Amino acid sequence: GAKNGVHPPLGWIPIQDARIRQHGYNVISAAFPVILPDGTALWEDGMDANVKVATPAEMCQAKAAGATMVMSIGGAAAAIDLSSSSVADKFVSTIVPILKRYNFDGVDIDIEAGLSGSGTFGTLSASQANLVRIIDGILAQMPSNFGLTMAPETAYVTGGSVTYGSIWGAYLPIIKKYADNGRLWWLNMQYYNGAMYGCSGDSYEAGTVKGFVAQTDCLDKGLVIQGTTIRVPYDKQVPGLPAQSGAGGGYMSPSLVGQAWDHYNGSLKGLMTWSINWDGSK
């Protein structure tokens, strides 16, 4: 898996550029649509400074060459007001036509702001409920084979082993819902820009094989929060890593990535990098 960031200073890489596949990327998560305060989603040239988007024909060309195309929603700068169901509904009503027009195969949830847990695992907060509302709203209007992936930061997932509430573990009930019902294609948890947590509140340094293994094993074993087990098996894990040191904290050299990957003897679904643009700019 891979992220295709739209950061203009790094240079534009056409979605159908043959080098993407030549370097091993078979999934492209196009990031990110602009979200207006009322929830309206924008996916167009100039939606952000100097940004271009692939045309529907270019998307089909990339897909014909073997790429799976996913739209990544959120990121550090594209927040959505999760306190409002009307904003959630507006987002769904404007993003679904875009997903259909541009021939996307799935959607990746990478919302990094505004999501907060209630403190009681069995009770969703308003923000969690509205994120579920968005996901369900999208899936209901797309084909049954339309994909769902998620790319949360560690605090929102394994951070729940430290405490459950606020951002800590806030993705866990959402991950559980879609992992258990079979709609989650895979989890792209970000193994960077933060501490790496095990299942017992233990913490590891980002960018290390030890931290990689601790988190990956924790998710496969199952994280227990207030008596509820949330499990993401190895074959639904696609750990996210920085493509180079400038892309984020916790960069792992290719040799370290190889050690971590080989530890699992091919049982992991794959690896994600942030991002194709960062990779191509090196």
UniProtKB/Swiss-Prot annotation:
Record: active site: 112 (proton donor)
InterPro entries the record matches: Glyco_hydro18_cat, Glyco_hydro_18_chit_AS, Glycoside_hydrolase_SF, Glycosyl_Hydrlase18_Chitinase
EC identifiers of the protein: 3.2.1.14
GO molecular function, one term: endochitinase activity
Keyword field contains Secreted: yes
The reaction(s) this protein catalyses: Random endo-hydrolysis of N-acetyl-beta-D-glucosaminide (1->4)-beta-linkages in chitin and chitodextrins
Keywords assigned by UniProt, alphabetized: Carbohydrate metabolism, Chitin degradation, Chitin-binding, Glycoprotein, Glycosidase, Hydrolase, Polysaccharide degradation, Secreted, Virulence
Localisation: Secreted
Residue positions the entry lists as glycosylated: 265
Gene Ontology CC terms, in alphabetical order: extracellular region
PANTHER family noted in UniProt: ENDOCHITINASE
Family: Belongs to the glycosyl hydrolase 18 family. Chitinase class V subfamily.
Protein name: Endochitinase 4
Organism field: Metarhizium anisopliae
